[in-house]
């Protein structure tokens, strides 16, 4: 367990909330619990007191008391993070994770690459918007059509998405209806209901799903990864993630957000994501 000194009131007031929300959202859709570790490495700091052994230990009563004091009520602000999942021809789908700590909400919105949106007084598929104006165009289309104000973006191709999911042990996913998919690429059979899915099965389920189902899957992924055990593995997760994607989120962004992300993972009063139709992105 990290030193209790890390969570002093002085430190909590000094960090920039904006960077926390961006990092927090990142670990939400996929997925790596970031840490200050790499940033410290780059400065040759001694981090022995910041991160302990990877060996599993049993929490003491004192540790449990500290953990139970963490609360998301200390956090505030709002940010929208964009994920673009590419295929050979352009966009497979995009996902926005909109986090608002002021009203304790987290909204997941997916848009298929073939979906038509209003863009510059025209109706275009979001894939066409991406080919025409790249990330800037996609951000404008999402703002005009859904009122999302994207702060940062992450771009993954399908293979990179699969690699990111494989960083985790698996996910507790609510399968919305029976699945019996057979194609040249892969077969997938699932029974309706909540169940544990491997990273590979989760990836396949995402690939064959519509927007509403994708949103539900991603919400379940978020719930599975924003937990204390993954907060303790942040160094390897961070390294693997940034090696798999294109993003405008810097190592410093992660470093300045690590403490609050850690607090959220241990908080007993955390809120959870909802699909776009159920939530409110205002």
Positions of the model-derived regions?
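Non-catalytic, solvent-exposed segments at the cell envelope interface
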Residues: 2-20, 24-282
